[in-house]
Amino acid sequence: MSYRELVVELAREHAEALSDALLELGALSVSVEDADADTPDEQPLFGEPGLVPDRTAWQRSRVIALLSPDHEPAVLLAAAVNDIGVTETPKFDVREVEEQDWVRLTQSQFEPIPIGERIWVVPSWHDAPDPDALILELDPGLAFGTGSHPTTRLCMEWLEQSVKPGQSVLDYGCGSGILAILARKCGANPVVGIDIDPQAVESARQNSERNHAEVTYGLPDACPAGEFDIVVANILSNPLKLMASMLASKVKPGGRIALSGVLARQADEVAAVYARYVDISVWREHEGWVCLAGTRRESH
């Protein structure tokens, strides 16, 4: 059985309403994209947490609806356009989508990832390329962090070089648990992972069990009192700035902190906020992202 995609380009003010109408009329799924994506006219839309976007769609939006074979695209679009009160049906394309083994297709897109000097992130359906390496078995899932994003890679490389056996580590914004698991495999103990998303916490627990890594996970209100030898936070620049005092207070005097989720152009601004508490600078840059690292001063 093959499916069809209905692709419609239209102005910003109608994109959301058309999406809702298509779903109500039986579309299996609907997505809205920037019609100018991958061109010089591409427009960033959503900001970081704590910042309110000023638009809900792009000036030139592309609405893509997945339809079952029993839906006639032109008829469905005409009905949707009528429902939202648009007088003229916009131009559209129809693309055939062949049925596939989606599980196998998805798995084929994720290969083992080498990171740093001896780390491999390996999906469960692959064998480890080097059995003697430091292996993290992780599958793509609901929580962020499989080693493919530059910020995750930067933090992993920093942890590999920085963690010493027996040190305590806090991974704030743990996502999949990848950084906490790596810290534990590097010899850190105890290791704590904190995230605001209960699904991420559960995912991280499962990943730790799969990797035989003893890590304590919880929501922010479960973050233990006291200080850690190492604190790592791979979030985004705005939350990092808002939490600077709290995160810095979790680092022992003389302890170390690493921050990522920060674009190179945001590095100075984030560093300036943390400079009250730690001596911090850009440790490494990769693909436009940076990892900031520093040491908490003994006087604070």
Curated annotation (Swiss-Prot):
Biological process GO terms, please?
methylation
Q: Write down the species.
A: Burkholderia ambifaria (strain ATCC BAA-244 / DSM 16087 / CCUG 44356 / LMG 19182 / AMMD)
Q: Which residues form a coiled coil?
A: none
Protein's name in the database: Ribosomal protein L11 methyltransferase
Which cell locations does it reside in?
Answer: Cytoplasm
Q: What is its main location?
A: cytoplasm
| Keywords noted in UniProt | Cytoplasm, Methyltransferase, S-adenosyl-L-methionine, Transferase
Q: What class of enzyme is it?
A: transferase
**Which amino acids does the record list as binding S-adenosyl-L-methionine?**
T152, G173, D195, N234
Q: Which domain of life is it from?
A: Bacteria
**Has keyword Ribosomal protein?**
no
Its Enzyme Commission number? 2.1.1.-
